[in-house]
Amino acid sequence: MNQRRRTQAERRAETRAAVLESACRLFGNKGYADTSLDEIAAGSGLTIRPIYHYFGNKVQLFAAVNEAMEERIVASLQANAADAPKDPILSAWRNFLELCEDSEFRRIVLIDSPNILGRERWAESPVTRMAAALLLEYRGNMDQRSAEIAGRMIIGALSEAALTVAESDDPASAARAAEAIAKRVSAALLQAGQAE
């Protein structure tokens, strides 16, 4: 049987994907500090050398994992926003909370990322830019700078609420309480955007 040989680019992409998958699983389950590059290499069925080749070091590998998670957030929020024209902020909150039910996602994005990559990174993240764009699109007269600041505030509030819900003894009750607050915040932003 004559099978087509994979190209160098295909092999590289597969290797990179295997490392990212292993890193995501281990960073998500054990956390950044308790995960070694040797474990990631073993989990991907490779030696440690490809990790250094493709990612440079552990921090850069973690940044790539975090970026993949951010892309997941943006894709999910974009798909959801199209279905929720009435109140996209509340809809985004619900969607984000669903993503945060995944313990790997929560550990990487909400717990380790701010500590490893720095909080200031959020200011330029695609998630914050999307939140600001949502505010500009749906919140009337809010100017660009106000939307950026509000976007960062919303991301911070959503992240903290998601952690609170996840750590609660009664997550369902905590989620309902957080959603009630999110409704009030969304309504207040709507009023503020119309008043400016």
Language-model-detected regions and their locations in the chain:
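C-terminal peripheral helix-coil segments that are non-catalytic and often amphipathic
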Residues: 1-3, 95-98, 128-140, 157, ...
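Helix-turn-helix
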Residues: 2, 14-18, 22-60, 64
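Residues at secondary-structure transition points
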Residues: 3-10, 14, 56, 60, ...
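Secondary-structure edge/capping motif, primarily at the C-terminal ends of alpha-helices
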Residues: 80-81, 107-110, 165-169
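Amphipathic alpha-helical segments used for helix-helix packing
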Residues: 99-119, 132, 163
